Amino acid sequence: APPGFTPFRID
């Protein structure tokens, strides 16, 4: 996964 990837949505 790329840097800063998150499996959760962040608005």
From Swiss-Prot:
It is found in: Secreted. Its main location: secreted. One of its GO terms (biological process) is defense response. Disulfide bonds: none annotated. GO terms for cellular component: extracellular region. Keywords: Amphibian defense peptide, G-protein coupled receptor impairing toxin, Secreted, Toxin, Vasoactive, Vasodilator. Expressed by the skin glands. One of its GO terms (molecular function) is toxin activity. Produces in vitro relaxation of rat arterial smooth muscle and constriction of intestinal smooth muscle. May target bradykinin receptors (BDKRB). Belongs to the bradykinin-related peptide family. This is [Ala1,Thr6,Asp11]-phyllokinin. It comes from Physalaemus signifer.
